[in-house]
Amino acid sequence: MKNVSPRRNKHYKSYKPQVPLKKPVLLPQHPPYRNRRKKKYQQNKYFPDFTFLLSYPVIKIRKVALKKLQKLPHKNDFNLANSLQNCQLGQNATNLILLLLFSLDHYTPLILNLAFSLTDFSKSSNCFINLSKVYPPLKPFP
């Protein structure tokens, strides 16, 4: 009789057949912490409130506000203008939001006029970019 190792010998007591390992079934998990934290800031979809941006550093503000602005459909430019008018911000933050408005893919005369009405460009020394250079001021929108 051949010298067979005990694992290969089926008649050996401790024989265990090699079963391929099953992948563990993943149970649905609760969303990670960072998603739950967002609930604090959840606003009406079409009227985003920009006041929470004041507590963020500048780089983060760009990211957050751009995301919010890009989510808005084209039709809701008027709503966006309203929400910007409603939030009472410091000069610096308003300039920042204007900057973000200009970095959008599309902007309508309504938004542009709102942007120019929000900031007095002659006084705003702390504006990151003088927006009147970026885009010439428009006539009042009817």
From Swiss-Prot:
Species for this entry: Aquifex aeolicus (strain VF5)
Low complexity: bias regions: 16-28
Listed Basic residues bias regions: 1-14
Record's protein name: Uncharacterized protein aq_aa13
Key words, A-Z: Plasmid
UniProt region (Disordered), positions on chain: 1-40
